[in-house]
Design a protein with these regions (language model features):
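Glycine-rich phosphate/pyrophosphate-binding loop and the adjoining helix
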Residues: 2-10, 150-224
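A generic structural motif
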Residues: 41-46, 148
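N-terminal beta1-alpha1 ligand-phosphate binding loop
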Residues: 5-41
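N-terminal beta-loop-helix "entrance" segment that forms/cooperates
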Residues: 50-67, 163-166
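Helix-loop-strand module that forms the ligand-binding subsite of alpha/beta enzymes
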Residues: 67-146
Length: 224
């Protein structure tokens, strides 16, 4: 049979990193687990370190005099080289870490905007009973403002010192939920990669399916 010229779809490329500088942080462990599961589900994973994206405090005078720092340029390259991203972020005082917000502020200065149109999944691991959920809600705000399609189902792992004792989630139910959440995110990002129409019509809902009066759909561009 003659070669039809068709080739398998290229693998989904996913950037994964923890918004923590400590190598042994709970969120680094959760990010590493997410990277492993993503690879097991067929993705090509770019596991990065927050230390790769070191930047000074945002300063407009510094930007005007020296340009955007290398750490922010590094995150931009990683975002542009991948189809989607996963961030595992700790919660500091009911919000996201300051170093992550500062990095996002620097990256927001790029045009075209590297966060725009990319799918993102937010995770958190915390020793508290809340699991870092408040920090993830705070993190959604700047990412969505910059055009990220943040996956509706975030994952917060409470009492993570016990739950991640061996680098994996020991509780079977939680482990299954974590893996299912990742698989659903990867499926959506994969569909967006191979079917461009999905990028132009994005429906987001939390908990219940959208209704005609409550859903949010980005307008589809049409040529006249």
């Amino acid at each position: 049979m003659a070669d039809s010229g068709r080739h398998p779809n290229p693998k989904l490329k996913v950037l994964v990193f923890a918004a923590s500088l400590r190598a042994e942080s709970l969120n680094h462990k959760l990010a590493t687990l997410a990277a492993r599961i993503a690879e097991e589900n067929g993705a090509t994973v770019d596991l990065a370190s927050m230390r790769d994206f070191d930047v000074p405090s945002y300063d407009g005078d510094l930007e005007a005099g020296q340009g955007i720092p290398a750490g922010a340029q590094g995150l931009r390259r990683h975002l542009m080289d991948n189809d989607a991203f996963i961030i595992s972020s700790p919660e500091y005082n009911g919000s996201m870490p300051g170093l992550l917000k500062n990095l996002i502020d620097w990256v927001s200065r790029f045009r075209p905007q590297p966060f725009d149109g990319r799918h993102g999944l937010l995770l958190s691991a915390s020793p508290s009973l809340a699991g870092g959920n408040r920090g993830l809600w705070a993190l959604r705000v700047p990412l969505e403002h910059l055009g990220t399609r943040v996956f509706p189902d975030m994952f917060s792992l409470a009492m993570a010192e016990k739950a991640l004792a061996d680098g994996d989630i020991g509780d079977t139910t939680l482990r299954r939920r974590f893996e299912k959440n990742l698989q659903s995110f990867l499926s959506l990002a994969e569909a967006a990669k191979h079917y461009p129409c999905i990028k132009r019509a994005w429906v987001e809902f939390l908990g219940e399916p959208p209704t005609s009066g409550a859903d949010r759909v980005d307008p589809v561009e049409t040529s006249i």
